[in-house]
């Protein structure tokens, strides 16, 4: 499943089967109840069996919150995020695969992007244009949220782009890196950055 030659060639990973374990390439806590281990076809994924903390509160991913037309694509991406090392490390990052807790947080930030696409009449990741990403950037920058939240919202789009060659063509973002590969610190750090329209405001309900 994680054949490095396939990854190097940009070959998409084969579709998981309905009964493929969600935590296929993760260590499972030996004390976890096997009945609580999710499979790919389920719309709620329990990530708790992959943690080794004592008395951990159950957590996971709820795909029923994702617009129906995006659900299959988002499940495919997050299954890769859980089980496959990132083809490219995030700028400033130190890991190739996120901790499961971090994946839960990534799901929330990425969900805001998906809902924004849906609200704006963009009917799939393959239909996203560079102009759409520029508009999302502008609205995130103008949103009345913290800089850290803005960094998370933009960073998850960049992370998704980094997995594009492992995904089917119809759920890939454009080949050019989002925002021409600009460092998020540059995008977020200078309120007077030229050429960025900050007038529109992203709906905070989307976030």
Residue ranges and their predicted role:
Residues 1-207:
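Charge-rich, intrinsically disordered N-terminal extensions
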């Amino acid at each position: 499943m994680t054949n490095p030659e396939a990854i190097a060639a940009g070959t998409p990973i084969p579709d998981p089967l309905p009964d493929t374990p969600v935590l296929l390439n993760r260590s499972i806590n030996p004390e976890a109840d096997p009945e609580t281990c999710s499979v790919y076809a389920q719309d709620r994924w329990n990530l708790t069996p992959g943690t080794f903390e004592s008395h951990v509160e159950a957590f996971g991913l709820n795909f029923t919150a994702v617009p129906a037309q995006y659900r299959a694509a988002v499940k495919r991406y997050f299954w890769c995020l859980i089980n496959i090392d990132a083809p490219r490390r995030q700028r400033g990052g130190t890991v190739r695969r996120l901790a499961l807790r971090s994946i839960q947080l990534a799901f929330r930030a990425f969900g805001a992007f998906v809902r924004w696409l849906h609200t704006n009449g963009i009917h799939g990741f393959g239909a996203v244009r560079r102009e759409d990403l520029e508009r999302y950037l502008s609205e995130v920058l103008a949103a009345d949220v913290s800089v850290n939240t803005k960094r998370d919202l933009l960073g998850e789009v960049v992370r998704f782009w980094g997995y594009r060659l492992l995904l089917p063509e119809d759920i890939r973002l454009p080949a050019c890196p989002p925002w021409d590969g600009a460092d998020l610190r540059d995008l977020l750090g200078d309120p007077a950055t030229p050429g960025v329209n900050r007038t529109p405001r992203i709906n905070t309900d989307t976030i």
